[in-house]
């Protein structure tokens, strides 16, 4: 009887985990779309602010001044 109960509970957990992962997959797709839209935005011109994730048009960020190089 105990073995049957354990198998039943395991099956319930697997079914719940599968359903949850499907919901998360939708959110992952949305996050991926959001990330792609950020990557397609325009670059920061020289003198503009840049940081750890610089998107400078010149591909060069002066970390000390936190500005994009020319």
Curated annotation (Swiss-Prot):
Subcellular location: Secreted
Signal sequence region: 1-17
Any one GO molecular-function label of the UniProt entry: ion channel inhibitor activity
Tissue: Expressed by the venom duct.
GO cellular component: extracellular region
Keyword vocabulary terms for this entry: Disulfide bond, Knottin, Secreted, Signal, Toxin
Positions annotated as propeptide: 18-41
Pfam families from the UniProt entry: Conotoxin
Region described as Disordered: 20-41
Taxonomic superkingdom: Eukaryota
Disulfides per UniProt: 43-57, 50-61, 56-68
Main location: secreted
Domain comment, as recorded: The presence of a 'disulfide through disulfide knot' structurally defines this protein as a knottin. The cysteine framework is VI/VII (C-C-CC-C-C).
Similarity comment: Belongs to the conotoxin O1 superfamily.
Name of the protein: Conotoxin AbVIB
Taxonomic source organism: Conus abbreviatus
């Amino acid at each position: 009887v105990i073995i049957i109960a354990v198998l039943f509970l395991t099956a319930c957990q697997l079914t719940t985990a599968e359903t949850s992962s499907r919901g998360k997959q939708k959110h992952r797709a949305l996050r991926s779309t959001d990330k792609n839209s950020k990557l397609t935005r325009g670059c920061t011109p020289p003198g503009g602010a840049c940081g750890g994730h610089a998107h400078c048009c010149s591909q060069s960020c002066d970390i000390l001044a936190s500005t994009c190089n020319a």
